[in-house]
Amino acid sequence: MQQLTEIVEQALAAIEQATDLKVLDDIRVDYLGKKGQITDLMKLMGTLSAEEKPKFGQAVNDAKQSVQAKLGEQMELFKARELEAKLAAEQIDVTLPGRTLDNGGLHPVTRTIERIESFFGELGFTVKQGPEIEDDFHNFDALNISEHHPARADHDTFYFNPKVMLRTQTSGVQIRTMETEKPPLRIISPGRVYRNDYDMTHTPMFHQVEGLLVDENVNFAELKGILHDFLRNFFEEDLQVRFRPSYFPFTEPSAEVDVMGKNGKWLEVLGCGMVHPNVLRSVGIDPEKYSGFAFGMGVERLTMLRYGVNDLRAFFENDLRFLKQFK
């Protein structure tokens, strides 16, 4: 027991004289490690009588706890001193401005789509989506586009095989809606479309929004009124708008819509017309009872006109210097 008492006193004295955490850890190993001085005393248990063993074992455990408690106390003291020294060495100038994070912003094409959806949503139009990989019936046949129409040519359309292609327009969404829902219908279908073209005003992938209204006694005057209001709302100006006759296989009569630009020239912005009876028949709607109108617009085209962008390709080059202008 005398030897144990001396070892504990030596350990406590060493802990008191320790200068840092490393020295404390060395002391812990020297006295409490597997080969430490206090641990080695347990080997004496074999030389003791049955009556002495419990008392000696208890004394060794008490010694361990005493040394461990002193080590823990001293370690906390050193950690506190280290933290205090670190804080004293670090100086913070509270007058410096904070580190700001740039807020993200919507892509200009997304802004335009949301603006279009908002306007037509207030008129009762719902947003419909459809597949971007389309079959020839929904992309061409049901839209009254003949087998020999130029739009079906390989140089205009990306084909997977003669019957399957990347959609060239979102009109297929209108066909699918009319196949599954009964009139009255009011829908718009925004989405990506694909055509084999690439220059300052065309890219192989771009965005369209097409609209469809089918009901009884629908007429061209309603179409003109809605599109006229839309264009004035979108450009936030009292624009001059004109409708001029045109041709689309899926509408009859058909028109293209122009607005007067700031340079005094007419600018084409969208196409429209009354839904062709053949299109209604292809989806099982009686053209004698129902009529409708449809319209389609290129999102990038409208965005270019609204923001004065000259090159459509800039929307897809991910240049932050360009995109940050629309935040």
From Swiss-Prot:
EC number: 6.1.1.20
CDD domains named in the record: PheRS_alpha_core
Subcellular location per the Swiss-Prot or TrEMBL entry: Cytoplasm
Positions that bind Mg(2+): E252
Major subcellular location class: cytoplasm
Catalytic activity entry: tRNA(Phe) + L-phenylalanine + ATP = L-phenylalanyl-tRNA(Phe) + AMP + diphosphate + H(+)
Cofactor(s) this protein requires: Mg(2+)
Listed GO CC annotations: cytoplasm
Keywords carried by this UniProt record: Aminoacyl-tRNA synthetase, ATP-binding, Cytoplasm, Ligase, Magnesium, Metal-binding, Nucleotide-binding, Protein biosynthesis
Biological process (GO), any one: phenylalanyl-tRNA aminoacylation
PROSITE patterns, sorted: AA_TRNA_LIGASE_II
Keyword Ion transport among UniProt keywords: no
Comment on bound cofactor: Binds 2 magnesium ions per tetramer.
Listed InterPro entries: aa-tRNA-synth_II, aa-tRNA-synth_II/BPL/LPL, Phe-tRNA-synth_IIc_asu, Phe-tRNA_ligase_II_N, Phe_tRNA_ligase_alpha1_bac, Phenylalanyl-tRNA_Synthase, tRNA-bd_arm
Highest taxon above the source species: Bacteria
Record-level Gene Ontology MF annotations: ATP binding; magnesium ion binding; phenylalanine-tRNA ligase activity; tRNA binding
NCBIfam families: pheS
Subunit structure: Tetramer of two alpha and two beta subunits.
Protein family membership: Belongs to the class-II aminoacyl-tRNA synthetase family. Phe-tRNA synthetase alpha subunit type 1 subfamily.
Stated name of the protein: Phenylalanine--tRNA ligase alpha subunit
Gene: pheS
